[in-house]
Amino acid sequence: MGNIRETNIKRTAFSLLENYGDVFTKDFETNKALVTKYTTIESKIIRNRVAGYVTRKVARMKVY
């Protein structure tokens, strides 16, 4: 079974992918820095969850 993400994490991730989708990669560390750059998220936990969700979505988009 997979993890269930909160709505605010999904909404933020989809917004980032819609606006800056071409700069995100399959690398979590790179995406973590980009999430910090493009958002005002102060919480480390929320930032990491958004970066992880973006990483998974980018990896799935590249496969198909």
UniProtKB/Swiss-Prot annotation:
Keywords: Ribonucleoprotein, Ribosomal protein
Gene Ontology CC annotations of this record: cytosol; ribonucleoprotein complex; ribosome
TM region(s), chain numbering: none
Biological process per Gene Ontology, one example term: translation
Family matches, as InterPro entries: Ribosomal_eS17, Ribosomal_eS17_CS, Ribosomal_eS17_sf
GO MF annotation terms: structural constituent of ribosome
HAMAP family: Ribosomal_eS17 (MF_00511)
Family stated for the protein in its record: Belongs to the eukaryotic ribosomal protein eS17 family.
Descriptive protein name: Small ribosomal subunit protein eS17
Origin species: Methanosarcina acetivorans (strain ATCC 35395 / DSM 2834 / JCM 12185 / C2A)
Gene: rps17e
